[in-house]
Every structure is written in structure tokens, then in C-alpha cells.
Amino acid sequence: KIPEVEEYTRAELLAMEKETAGLYLSGHPMDEYRAAVRRAGIVPIGAILTDSASESEKKTYPDGAVVTVAGVVQSSRTRTTKSNTLMSYINLEDDTGAMELIAFQRALDTGSIYIKDNAPIIVRGRISMRDEKEPQLMADSIRPITDLGKLKPEPPRTNADSKLWVKLPGEDDPRLARIELILTMFPGQQQMIIYLECEKRRIGARCLIHPSLIAELKELCGDANVFLEAN
């Protein structure tokens, strides 16, 4: 008698297809969530990629836009930054496309438990455009797909005109070099101003204004020396 073997679940079958063929053949893991995703106002990854590739100057999802996406984790890797905090690169795919997410310590503190291969997740964050690269998403929060019902539709928002101020005593302050290093992890086109108090001079820089960036700067320079000016 041939022993009975439990049938694979749909999710297991799809994962096997992806592993062996390099693509999903009989469907996509996000198919069963499509209606709920639409009701929640989730932005399709393909829409972000298409908008980025468009030659139009007026973007629907510009640098710094806040969006929520949902998809399955294709891969992830975590490393420790020079400021001794964790940073993860996550490849997320929905049924319209795939994009890279970057999650820092703040998002990982509550969301790392959900980052598993083939796991469906919801990610809220800010779009980061850099040079000719495809857009990335700087994650603010990572949640399980079961939280879909708790989401309310909302349009993408930007704070493109905001300015981030950091105050230092002078140019010889060793923290200036640390700030420059931190900024390399938050590429973007939003304005940051470092005010050198003794010299009464300003240094301008461009970055993606992100909660994790603000948190890192406050830890380095003190809460009173970091200020977000929202226009």
C-alpha cells in the first residue's frame, strides 16, 4: 500500500516553483490578497517602477513620497552599520514587480520577526531615488499581511519642501565626519542644513529625510540640535 502523503499547500507549491524555475508558474503568492490590497489603498510596486521610468517631470511617486506596499519577501540580508546599528536589504515582490527595501534599526526593532523568505508583508516607507538606479523604499514600518484589514486608504504624501537642520559648534567638530557618513545611507534630494554656531555658517547637503536618519542624528548630536522644518 502506498502511504498517504499530505498535499502541499498553495503557498508551498508556489515557493517550489520559484525555487526550481526562477518564477511563479501557476499564480502568485499575493493573488489571494489582491482584493484586500486594493481596498487598503496599497500602491502596486509596478506603478512605482513605471512612474520612475517615465520621462515626465511631474511624478506620482517622487523622491520622498510616503507609500505603503505589500508583497512577498524574495531575499534579505542584514549587516551592522558603522554606527553599530542594524540595516537590512529586502527584495520584495508583488504581482506587478519587485523592488529593494532598506530597513534600519527603528523599523527592524518591531518588524524583523516578519522578514522571512516567501513571507507576505506590508511595508510603509519613503521612496528614495538615486542617480539612474531603480527606486528603493526606505522602510518606516514592517507588518504582517494579516494587518491588511487595519489599514485605511491614503494618498502618497511628500515633504519635499521640508528642511532638516543640525547644529554643531564648528567645522572642527569630529561629529561632522560622522554626519557625512550617516548621510551616505540616506541618499535623496531633500534639503539638510548643518549650522556651525561659532562661525555662524551653513553647510548644505541633500538627503532623504527619514525617521531613522533623524533618530541617528539626535543620538549623535542631541535632541536639541536636530530640527525638522516643515514648509
Where do the protein language model's features map onto the residues?
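Noncatalytic, beta-rich nucleic-acid-contacting surfaces in large DNA/RNA-processing enzymes
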Residues: 1-231
